[in-house]
Amino acid sequence: MLKVSKYVTGVVQTNVYFCYDDETRACVIIDPAANAPHIIRIIEEELHLKPEAILLTHGHFDHIMAAKDVAQHFGIKIFACADEAETLADPKRNLSGNFGVEVTLQPGEYETFRDGDTLHHLGREWKVLETPGHTPGSCCFYIADGLSFQPEGATEPKIYSVLFSGDTLFKESFGRTDFVGGSQEAIVKSIVEKLLVLPADTSVFPGHEAQSSIGNEQKYNPAVFLGRVNL
């Protein structure tokens, strides 16, 4: 059974996710934002996990600051969208320069994937959905058979799909598009055409703030109205 644990850290309160197999303790880390020593301590001492990969939803500094240190500590690889290379490599584009630091990931320091690729972790298929708009190479990760939950009175558990949406889709909102490389038109198109077409009971784990579901976003996300669609 897969489980998801969240740790909030950094100057803009970024959600770091640990998606793991409850039996094997194998783990995928999504967006190790900051405070590498504490992330490592949570993994080793609190959750007792065995990381096998780091996945990045996009290249802004508040989602990648701890990536290299965590990857080196556990001897694992970092994966990011190929179209996010410029953001990852440039402190101005990834916004770290705005805070007086230079955080970068250069080509060769991470592996790449593209839209439509399927990653294999924790015995599941993770579909890459490239969702430009917040940044040119923003992406989300979709697991069709993600979480198992047995409602009260049910004889069998129900399987829920999972979406790690980064800063593309938030609860009843979406990511900022006023940074370098951002586009409101692109993010609305990404959300409407790639995310809101997923099953309504899909659990959405965003890069900031509270969890949601696709069904909730189909009703209340402003992208629905900005995209002039009727879902």
Write out the residue ranges for each language-model feature.
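Conserved S/T- and glycine-rich ATP-binding loop of Class I adenylate-forming
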Residues: C19, T57, T131
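Active-site HxH/HxHxD metal-binding segment of metal-dependent hydrolases
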Residues: C27, A34-E125, G146-Q150, K219-G227
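Hydrophobic residues at beta-strand termini and immediately following loops
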Residues: Y7, F113, T131
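Conserved beta-strand hairpin/beta-sheet module of binuclear metal-dependent hydrolase folds
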Residues: M1-L47, C140-Q150, E156-P157, S161-F164
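Metallo-beta-lactamase
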Residues: R25, N94-L95, E125-L231
